[in-house]
């Protein structure tokens, strides 16, 4: 009998349920459900609707069982750094999104207790104002941690709601900025220094672990029973597993709402040069994902929403423009502006001529992203003291031929675009490995 597996891959802008199976040695997949995901602005803060998210998770499982009654297992991956605090096993609302500005006020205080250079040496995680370490400290200052009894990252929370088993998965935990790069566990010295309750940060679990089965009430609701397992719950970790590279250690670019450019390494690099370059050492499946976070398609997504046109139409508009001025896509001003187009125009006007048309603005975004990829690639080669001729691109951005061509131009490398659901494939690959009795 054909063995089917369900990957639930949720990004910051959408979620998808993808069923996968092996057919004559080839992985086949079918998307059975897709739903939008977006940030909610409430009382001046940016939040996730975690209840709607879980409802969509269940609806997608229901759709999967309707078409594929025999599903061997399922797993969930999502974006990193965000989490749910629990009291009496109930969420403490709101569930903030990483784009909320509440961390800005506490970052100096955290660094006065633990200078960033010291944090980086221990964790190897790059500075981002939204890292969980700053979010949790903001929660402590606001009194939210005092009432909390538990802490689960978003995918851990959703998996727990399905099977009733709480687990803290390694790859996603590393994104918090609280995991020691050498021990691969939450760092008690960091927790103690910041006054974070150690009981909420227990031993980590490796991807490829079976958590259990759907709880009876959930199974009845979705119309089927299956095993629930841990994949690499950080979507980028699953994406790297899903990229079919001829060279196992070739650089990759996971191109989605965020763009992550890096390479697999056996050991972390936590020296001062790496710290200054703001590269990160995130957990992978048996390796370190040494990479740089770049703003990514978020800027393009915001512009697309404002213009109300398709991504394909944006590409065609860009082709008509000779305007190629570059701006810093990683600047904090582009994280959650009220008006992305106005913010881009203002940034470009500060250093020269502003874009005259939307075509100019779009073309500038594409060139700026590709330029940033080129800079990050050169930093990667310098920091690792290695040289490569290829860059593998997966994710939504791999479908954008114009952006791929510009990336090849600015990196000076051969670009291998893989317009596949790399994250879902990595998620499925880990599940299949468990089913076959192997190790991940």
Segments from the language model and where they lie:
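Short, well-ordered amphipathic alpha-helical segments that serve as non-catalytic structural scaffolds
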Residues: 52-65, 183-189, 372-377
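Active-site core segments that coordinate phosphate-bearing ligands/cofactors
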Residues: 6-7, 111-123, 137-149, 153, ...
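Small/polar loops that bind or transfer phosphate-bearing groups
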Residues: 9, 95, 99, 131, ...
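Short beta-strand-loop/turn "lid" adjacent to the catalytic site in phosphate-handling enzymes
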Residues: 42, 62, 66-98, 123-130, ...
């Amino acid at each position: 009998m054909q063995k089917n597996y369900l990957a639930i891959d949720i990004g910051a802008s959408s979620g998808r349920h993808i069923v996968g199976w092996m057919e004559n040695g080839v992985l086949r997949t079918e998307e059975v459900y897709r739903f939008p995901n977006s940030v909610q602005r409430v009382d001046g803060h940016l939040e996730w609707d975690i209840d709607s998210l879980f409802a969509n998770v269940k609806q997608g499982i229901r759709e999967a069982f309707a078409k594929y009654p025999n599903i061997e297992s399922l797993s969930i991956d999502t974006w990193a750094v965000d989490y749910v605090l629990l009291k009496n096993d109930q969420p403490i609302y709101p569930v903030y999104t990483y784009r909320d500005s509440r961390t800005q006020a506490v970052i100096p205080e955290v660094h006065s207790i633990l200078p960033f250079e010291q944090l980086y040496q221990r964790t190897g995680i790059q500075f981002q104002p939204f890292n969980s370490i700053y979010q949790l400290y903001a929660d402590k200052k606001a009194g939210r941690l005092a009432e909390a009894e538990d802490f689960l990252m978003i995918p851990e929370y959703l998996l727990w709601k399905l099977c009733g088993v709480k687990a803290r998965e390694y790859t996603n935990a590393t994104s918090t900025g609280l995991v020691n790069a050498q021990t691969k566990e939450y760092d008690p010295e960091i927790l103690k220094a910041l006054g974070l309750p150690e009981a909420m940060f227990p031993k980590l679990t490796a991807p490829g672990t079976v958590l259990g089965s759907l709880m009876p009430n959930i199974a009845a609701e979705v119309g089927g029973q299956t095993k629930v397992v841990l994949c690499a719950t950080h979507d980028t970790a699953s994406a790297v597993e899903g990229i079919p590279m001829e060279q196992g250690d070739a650089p990759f670019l996971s191109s989605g709402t965020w763009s992550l450019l890096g390479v697999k390494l056996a050991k972390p690099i936590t020296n001062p040069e790496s710290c200054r370059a703001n590269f990160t050492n995130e957990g992978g499946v048996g390796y370190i994902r040494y990479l740089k976070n770049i703003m990514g398609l978020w800027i393009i997504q915001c512009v697309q929403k404002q213009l109300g046109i398709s991504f394909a139409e944006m590409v065609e508009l860009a082709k008509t423009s000779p305007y190629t001025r570059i701006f810093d896509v990683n600047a904090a001003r582009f994280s959650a502006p009220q008006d992305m187009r106005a913010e881009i125009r203002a940034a470009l006007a500060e250093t020269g001529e502003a874009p005259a048309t939307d075509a100019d603005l779009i073309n500038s975004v594409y060139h700026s992203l590709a330029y940033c990829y080129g800079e990050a690639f050169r930093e990667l080669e310098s920091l690792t003291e290695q040289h490569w001729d290829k860059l593998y691109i997966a994710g939504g951005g791999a479908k954008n031929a114009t952006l791929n061509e510009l990336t090849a131009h600015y990196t000076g490398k051969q670009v291998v675009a893989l317009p596949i659901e790399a994250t879902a494939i990595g998620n499925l690959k880990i599940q299949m490995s468990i089913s076959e009795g192997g190790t991940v």
